[in-house]
Amino acid sequence: NRICELCVPILYGSPKVAAYYRKVLNIENFSLNTIREPGEANGKRSNIINCVDDNVKVDLGKETPESDQATMVALKYALDQLDRDEIDVLTLAPQGPNAFFTEEAGSLVEYLGKRYNTTDIMSILVSEKIKMGFVTEQVKLRDVPHQVTQKNIFKKLTLLDDTLRQDFTILKPKIAVLGLNPQVNCGQNGDEEVNVIIPAIERAREEGIMAIGPFSAERFFSERMYEKFDAVLAMYYDQGVVAFKSVDEEGAACYVAGLPVICSMSLTDPHYDIVGQNMGDEQGLRNALYLAMDVCVHREQNIELQKNPLPHYDIAANSNESDLNVEQIEGVKEELED
């Protein structure tokens, strides 16, 4: 009921499969409103658009090629309607590891990047305690050093800074940058820190981005330094996601930044071992939906502000903005050292 008060939910899939699961779970006094297009949705009910073959085979608790194919069909159908502004946001339920593996892409983020013809894209893990972006997504560990370049780090810092400002309404984001090597912060920076990461951070600062680091991942999280920052940029996915889940796994969600559309997903695993037992925790999916709705509201607010901007005030002509930025950075460093 609360979700219907905040939005008009539309499920993309098969009404027949949904009815089968409802029967398995013995859910009474609930039915989905089958519609053909978003304009027919009932604001007081949960709606479903049939975009998958009704004869699709259902294997409880198993990911199959048929289920993965149905997932991609539903995703493409929903994205088409999202592109036409027929819906406002898209939130994905937990999926199996091969759901978005295609000939064109090996992950959802890669697929979305190809669909929208952009490499300036990043998944951001979001919880109440921490936000985390990544220089590299889910790539093989041996490929990480080749992708951790000054250019890529600067691009990700810029994207993360822009996203925090526009989609999360954080006016002056403070971003912590993790090192690639474990000995960072012990006076033993590796070649990657000295020649790649630090120069990228310095370039970002020249552009007005409050980036600080590099930090050792172990020390950064064990000493709870993340509490001083608005977001963290990890060098690779496993470096960040394990630490992220140790800080705040419950109800965390993922937001795909850098797209013209709003897309979020739950970080919860599909937990095939308990399928059909009515034991799943829906909070992760619920939070992913709330996250997408919040971003939608923030973007609409930004559009309105741009329509009626305040009179321009030339900061550069009236103050030394770079000095202010340096003072803020030094202040954060002093807090971390205390």
Q: Model-predicted segments: where are they?
A:
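Anion-binding alpha/beta catalytic cores of soluble intermediary-metabolism enzymes, centered on
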Residues: 1-338
